[in-house]
Regions:
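Bacterial Sec-dependent N-terminal signal peptides
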Residues: 1-23
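Catalytic loop of the DD-peptidase/beta-lactamase superfamily, centered on the K-T-G motif
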Residues: 20-55, 186, 192-195, 200, ...
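Active-site-proximal loop and beta-strand segments within enzyme catalytic domains
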Residues: 28, 39, 59-172, 188, ...
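Alpha-helical scaffold elements that line and support the substrate/ligand-binding pocket
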Residues: 43-52, 75-98, 102, 121, ...
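Short, solvent-exposed turn/loop segments enriched in Gly/Ser/Thr/Pro and often Arg
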Residues: 47, 109-110, 210-217
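Secretory-pathway/luminal and periplasmic proteins that interact with or process carbohydrate-rich
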Residues: 52, 111-117, 127-134, 191, ...
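Conserved residues at the C-terminal ends of beta-strands
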Residues: 124, 210, 442
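Non-catalytic beta-strand/loop surface segments
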Residues: 177, 215-220, 224
């Protein structure tokens, strides 16, 4: 269950999109991302009631060649936390608890409960240790039923990491206790109550908890690694081992229905939502990470659970929504494949604040014998004297700009090269005889010619 992290850099390349609609821009970005083999999963982007893009990319089940579509069912890991927080706020609205209540009111046997409030649990400011840190959790315990007794046995005598409310530290244990609290107050299993209060009200008919025993042709296979030549299936963790911190499975369409139900105040009031979307410590509210963006506040959560990664982002001011599911658990290990590499450009496109956005490029295998023809020194056709020195290194071009740091450039097509180190490209031009005479440097919307001088 991975938390939501700050924005990650992506392998990006400038591309002007003057005449396209927002939906077309989103689709083109995703088509290029998939072509570059940087994503396998499902994406949905919407604003208000309008779904602008909803599409599957790659394989739901690689071995059996079953492709993704918008019906694919994914585990969402820590994106479960907003659901748990919404139920807690629902109970507060109905007078069944107060966020100022001490944990000891409900669990008097927990010796630290007298210093910890429900609000501390919601905001990860309790100081309670991470339950999954116990020995053999990811090797053994996560794959079999994990009970409340198991949880308290480990937690009850472990000291707090810090004085409650003095610091922030993300801990799934907080949301386990919130789940147990929901059960104690309602007299119903957590899963049943979430279904009644959220799934049913929002119309989320393809969502649930027990993914291991789910019988559906739309059930997605999770992979620890999903690369060109390596596809390693994940073991399916028991939903009870993720519980109220990360146990939900769902579809992109159902997540959009959850988003709409919140916008329309069908589950909790606008007042409760405003409280939930407040930054209490370190950019975290009640089950939501909070970000400031040029056109207003963003709320969301990131989730990861064996075989699956999820990113759920919502724009408070424009009712936008971006849902990204991947069944490649390793995607967050690389900034090029991290789900933020989709989320950030999508936000830019939805806002319309940029006339450009960025598309990943795909390198072809260069012919080593052809690369030396591009080497040489190229000079800007001006009095500035800016130079580019091009050499060959490790079967790609290396360019040094004005005697600075070297940049590796990879061939996309004949005479056109790109770098992964910046938003720059080189396009070599030839004369009538086929001899290379100059190079065009593409950088920050500019196209700057450089003549070959040696």
């Amino acid at each position: 269950m991975k938390p939501f992290y700050p924005l990650a850099p992506a392998l990006l390349l400038t591309h002007v999109l003057c005449a396209q609609t927002t939906a077309e821009k989103l689709a083109e970005y995703m088509d290029a991302t998939y072509k570059a083999k940087l994503f396998n999963g499902v994406v949905l982007a919407a604003r208000n009631d309008s779904i602008l893009l909803a599409k599957g990319y790659g394989w739901r089940d690689y071995e059996n060649r079953i492709p993704h579509d918008t019906n694919s069912i994914f585990r969402i890991g820590s994106v479960t936390k907003p659901f748990t927080a919404v139920v807690i706020l629902y109970l507060q609205e109905h007078g069944q608890l107060k966020l100022t209540d001490k944990v000891s009111k409900y669990f008097p046997e927990y010796k630290y409960g007298g210093n910890i409030t429900i609000k501390n649990l919601l905001t990860h400011t309790s100081g309670i240790i991470e339950y999954s840190n116990q020995d053999n959790f990811f090797e053994e315990l996560a794959y079999k039923p994990y009970t409340q007794k198991d949880f308290w046995k480990y937690i009850k005598n472990e000291p707090l990491d810090f004085e409650p409310n003095s610091e922030y530290s993300y801990s799934n244990s907080n949301y386990f206790i919130l789940g147990y609290l929901i059960e104690k107050i309602t007299g119903k299993p957590y899963e049943q109550y979430v279904r009644e209060i959220i799934f049913n009200k929002a119309g989320m008919t393809h969502s649930g908890f027990d993914f291991k025993n789910l019988q559906s042709s739309y059930k997605t296979v999770g992979y620890d690694v999903f690369h060109d030549s390596v596809h390693i299936r994940s073991r399916i963790a028991d939903s009870s081992a993720a519980y109220a911190a990360g146990g939900i499975y769902t579809t992109a369409g159902d997540m959009f229905r959850f988003h709409k139900a919140l916008i329309e105040n069908r589950i909790i009031s606008q007042k409760s939502q405003q409280e939930a979307y407040t930054n209490y410590k370190e950019g975290y509210g009640y089950g939501w990470y909070i970000r400031e963006w040029p056109k207003g506040k963003l709320i969301g959560h990131k989730g990861g659970i064996m075989g699956f990664c999820t990113l759920f982002t919502r724009g408070v001011s424009d009712n936008s929504c971006i849902i990204t599911f991947s069944n490649d658990y390793s995607c967050s290990d690389n900034p090029e494949t991290d789900l933020n590499a989709i989320d950030v450009p999508f936000l830019q496109i939805l806002e319309g604040t940029y006339t450009i956005y960025y598309i990943p490029r795909v390198a072809i295998k260069s012919n080593p014998a052809s690369l030396p023809q591009y080497t040489g020194t190229y000079k800007m056709d001006s009095t500035i004297g800016f130079t580019i020195d091009v050499t060959v290194k490790d079967n790609h071009l290396q360019a040094i700009f004005n005697n600075g740091n070297p940049y590796a450039f990879y061939e996309e097509k004949k005479d056109f090269f790109f770098t992964k180190q910046s938003n720059s490209q080189l396009e070599f031009e030839r004369d009538a005889s086929g001899k290379i005479i100059d190079v065009l440097l593409y950088f920050n919307r500019r196209k700057v010619p450089h003549l070959k001088i040696k």
